[in-house]
Amino acid sequence: MDQLRRSLQDAPIIEKDGYHYFVHPISDGVPMLEPSLLREIVIKIIRKASLENVDKIVTPAAMGIHISTAVSLMTDIPLVVIRKRQYGLEGEVALFQETGYSENQMYINDVEAGDRVLVLDDVLSTGGTLKAITEALGDIGAEVEDVVAVIKKVGGENKIDASPYAVKTLINVDVVDGEVVIVDERGDG
């Protein structure tokens, strides 16, 4: 995890409404995402995730897309993007996403009862997004085989902790005194 660790330690911190954010290529698209960093992350995801029975990778728009696309290309597992736009297609399922900084309606298409899915996201912070997604997938009747987030920001309430799903992460960090501190460079799971 050398590149991921270094890139997080070098990440600028911004404050918005009392919440401290790191600005990182994986979570924000800035600064520029180097292919070698993305490759390192994808290899770690493939090694950590339980993929044997997965039919589909499911990821929320927008910052899970680049990671999930790369994993899909490497594994030949189809990708479903949960969108913030409603299309009104048959079988579309709405979910309500609440994070530390926003509330949104999101929409799942192309997931059906019996599908076995990997849920993949960029950052686990409050757990609001992953909780909403896993609940909606359960309501559809899909089987959540695994849940992976690249980066976990520790501290504070994490809504996914109360769910039946254990989220695997690649690295766990905190923001202390305006800097990213690596809490566990191997993550959870």
Curated annotation (Swiss-Prot):
Job description of the protein: May catalyze a purine salvage reaction, the substrate is unknown.
Signal peptide as annotated in the record: none
UniProt xrefs under SUPFAM superfamilies: PRTase-like
InterPro entries per record: HGPRTase-like (IPR026597), PRibTrfase_dom (IPR000836), PRTase-like (IPR029057), Pur/Pyrimidine_PRTase (IPR050118)
EC number from the UniProt entry: 2.4.2.-
Gene Ontology BP annotations: purine ribonucleoside salvage
HAMAP family listed in its UniProt record: Hypx_phosphoribosyltr
Molecular function via GO: transferase activity
EC top class, as a word: transferase
Family under the similarity heading: Belongs to the purine/pyrimidine phosphoribosyltransferase family. Archaeal HPRT subfamily.
Protein name: HGPRTase-like protein 2
One Pfam assignment: Pribosyltran
Species of the source: Halalkalicoccus jeotgali (strain DSM 18796 / CECT 7217 / JCM 14584 / KCTC 4019 / B3)
Top-level taxon in the UniProt lineage: Archaea
UniProt KW keywords: Purine salvage, Transferase
Protein's UniProt keywords contain NADP: no
